[in-house]
Amino acid sequence: MHREGHLDDAYWALRLSLGSTAFLAGLDKFTNLLTNWDKYLAPQVREKLPVSGRKFMYGVGIIEMLVGVGILTRTPKLASYTASAWLLSIAAELALNGDYDIAVRDVNMAIAAYALARSEGERQHASEAEYGEDAGLERVA
């Protein structure tokens, strides 16, 4: 397998794992099967919310599902940058709550999402260089 094949494998591993994790974590905000997500909401944050912590988590879930779908479908670059920023903000909130171990994991996932966004940009650039500006149209025709 050439270098491009290995890079393609890494790209798809990141894309599938980050996209499915974001979607499933978002979906779980409605079921709490994996964990009770409300316990991760820092009291300092909860008291400033205009809605209940539960309703806030529903909103978080919707955003996470949209980001997951974006990574898995037609907007992986934008969705990955969004996931990266989102995960960093979650890590900061977790640190406020003293959940440092989970915050560190979220920082690592944020870095992975950033790497995915960057590699998607490189893939787009390589595709345009190989097929021209109308790369998408030529491949469909």
Give the role of each language-model region.
Residues 1-141:
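Membrane-interface extramembranous regions
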